[in-house]
């Protein structure tokens, strides 16, 4: 009744493989948040050491001054190995430079980040998908690794790069020029 047609299955397999490669070799940010476009990629270097390349994916109408009112994706492509615990602790330090929060919030957020952020190697990517009033979803190499559903955390965490008090003003300025 049904005849197997090897060429049909072979061509279907090729199509599936092509889709898989396209999704996994390219940036997943447009798929994570439809309608976003990348701003120019920026490199963060500290004391001459390259840390990561940062890319901000935004929708038309995005305003840096009111970044917490817009959905967007922040993508960090690491250029060196770092421990997840170091990323988490440094994030808390940087968040303090952007805004105030209590010791309880710090403890809760640090615990959440320690649970979420993995150790990274050169070539790994961390993405933060932000949706206003909801919080932040984190991905590691395009796989969801956790969520922190606290709008204040999201505002301060993403403010590390986007707030006017950022300690990486060159990244922010370059993205402002790209808007």
Q: Where are the regions that the model predicts?
A:
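Short regulatory "switch" loops immediately downstream of catalytic or recognition motifs
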Residues: 1-2, 21
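Bacterial N-terminal signal peptides that target proteins for export
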Residues: 2-14
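Generic low-complexity segments that are intrinsically disordered, proline-rich and/or Lys/Arg-biased
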Residues: 7-8, 21, 31
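Bacterial N-terminal signal peptides
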Residues: 12-24
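Terminal leader/tail segments of proteins
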Residues: 27-140, 144-179
């Amino acid at each position: 009744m049904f005849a197997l047609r090897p060429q049909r299955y072979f061509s279907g397999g090729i199509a599936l493989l092509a889709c898989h490669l396209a999704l996994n070799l390219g940036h997943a940010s447009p798929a994570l948040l439809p309608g976003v476009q990348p701003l120019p990629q920026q490199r963060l270097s500290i004391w001459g050491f390259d840390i990561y390349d940062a890319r901000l994916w935004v929708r038309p109408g995005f305003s840096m001054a009111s970044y917490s009112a817009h959905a967007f994706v922040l993508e960090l492509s690491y250029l060196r190995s770092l421990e997840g615990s170091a990323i988490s602790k440094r994030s808390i330090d940087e968040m303090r430079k952007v805004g105030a929060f209590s010791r309880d919030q710090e403890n809760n957020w640090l615990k959440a980040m320690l649970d979420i952020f993995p150790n990274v190697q050169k070539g790994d990517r961390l993405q933060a998908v932000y949706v206003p009033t909801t919080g932040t979803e984190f991905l590691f190499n395009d796989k969801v690794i956790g969520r922190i559903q606290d709008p204040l955390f999201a505002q301060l965490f993403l403010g590390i790069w986007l707030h006017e008090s950022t300690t990486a003003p060159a990244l922010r300025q370059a993205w402002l020029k790209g808007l």
